[in-house]
Amino acid sequence: MSAKVNKVVLAYSGGLDTSIIVPWLKQNYGNPEVICYCANIGQDDELSGLEEKAIATGASKCYVEDLREEFVRDFLFPLLQSGAVYERTYLLGTSVARPLIARRQAEIALQEGADALAHGCTGKGNDQVRFELTYMAFAPHLKVIAPWREWNIRSREDALDYAAEHNVPVTATLKSIYSRDRNIWHMSHEGGILEDPWNEPEEAMYTLTTDPEAAPDEPEYVVIGFEQGTPVSVNGKRLGPVELLLTLNDIGAKHGIGRVDLVENRLVGMKSHGVYETPGGTILRVAHQGLEQLTLDRDTLHYKDVIAHRYAELVYYGQWYTPLREALDAFVRVTQRNVTGEARLKLYKGNATLVGRRAAKSLYNPDIASFTMSDSYNQKDAEGFIKIFGLPVKVQALLEGRSRGER
C-alpha cells in the first residue's frame, strides 16, 4: 500500500478508467475519502447519472459543474482570436479544455481540505502534463496521484476485469475500441484501427458530423458577426457564446464540416494518430481569418502567424497558466481592436469556403486596389520602390559578376 492520504479529489468522467480509480484509491491509499469532480464542458449525454454512478462506485460525493459559458468565453474564443492550430491541423479541442477542468478540481480540493489530487491520464499521453502543470499553478502543495503510472493494469481487458472484481458498474465493453474525448468544441477519436496510420477511419466511428458524401446536395450560406474578434451573431441573430457555438456545430455537422485526420507529435516524445471532428470551430476559424484579412495590416498579420504557432504549442503543452500566455493574449487583444464585421461562408459537402467579408474599419480600399487607373495610386511610383527594394539583389549580382555573364 502507498502512503496514506485522508481525502482525495479525482478528476472524474464516469468512464471505465476513472470509475475503477475510485476503489483503487481506497484500496491503495489507506481508504481515503474520494470526492469526484466533473466539469460540464459540453459532453451532453455522457453526464447523465454521473453523480449516482460515482457514489455507487465508492465516492462520498460528486461535483458536476456547468462550465460551458466560461469555457467558450475565456478559453475557446481567446484561442480562436490567437489563430492557434497545432501542427497545421489540430484545433486543440482537448488541449484547451484541461486547464479549466484541472483548475476547478484544484479549487474544489482546497475548498474540501483534501490532501491529494488524482487524475486518470495515462503515462504515455499529454493530458497528465496539462493536469499536473495546472495543479502546480493552483495547489502546489497537494500530493498528485496518477494511477496509470502506478498500477498493474495494462489494457482495457485488465480494466474490465478489475471493474468486475470490485463490483464497479461500467457500460464499457471490449467492443468499445476507440478512446474518445468530447466537449462543445470537438470530438476526438484514437485507438482501434487508427493505431495503423494507413487505415482509413470507418464511417461508423464518426459521432458528430455527417459523411460529406451524404451531406445535402445544396450549399448553405452562413454569416458570422464579430465584435473585436469575438463572434457574436449567426445570420444576423445575436447569440451568447454557448448558443452560438452549438448553433454552428449543428449547421457544420449537417454539411460534414471539420473532419481532420492527423499524426501528431505528442509532448512526451512519441507520435500518435487521431481523428478530430470540429464543425463549429472550423467555421469560426475560417470566418475569423477572413475578417482579419481585411482589418490587420501586413506586418501585424504576418507576425501574428508567428505568435499563433507559439500559442498552439503553449496550449498543447499545458502551459495555459503562465506569464507567456498572458503576454501573448495581451498582444492578440490589441490585434483584435478592429476585427469587427461579418464573414460569409459557403458550406458544401465537407468544405467551409469564405465567400464574403466586410468590416467598418477595413484596410481594403477598392479605389487603390482596382486594376483601373485612378488618382489614388500613381503606378509610376512603383519604379523607384522596386529599385530600392531590389538593391541588395543587384549588389549581390554585381559582386558575383553576374552582369558580365561570369560564372
UniProtKB/Swiss-Prot annotation:
Catalytic activity reads: L-citrulline + L-aspartate + ATP = 2-(N(omega)-L-arginino)succinate + AMP + diphosphate + H(+)
Q: Which organism is it from?
A: Roseiflexus sp. (strain RS-1)
Q: Where does L-citrulline bind?
A: 90, 95, 126, 130, 179, 188, 264, 276
Task: Name the gene.
Answer: argG
Protein's UniProt name? Argininosuccinate synthase
Which EC class heads this enzyme's classification? ligase
HAMAP family, alphabetically? Arg_succ_synth_type1
* UniProt-listed CDD domains: ASS
Q: Which PROSITE patterns match?
A: ARGININOSUCCIN_SYN_1, ARGININOSUCCIN_SYN_2
What does the subunit section of this Swiss-Prot or TrEMBL entry state? Homotetramer.
> Which family, according to UniProt?
Belongs to the argininosuccinate synthase family. Type 1 subfamily.
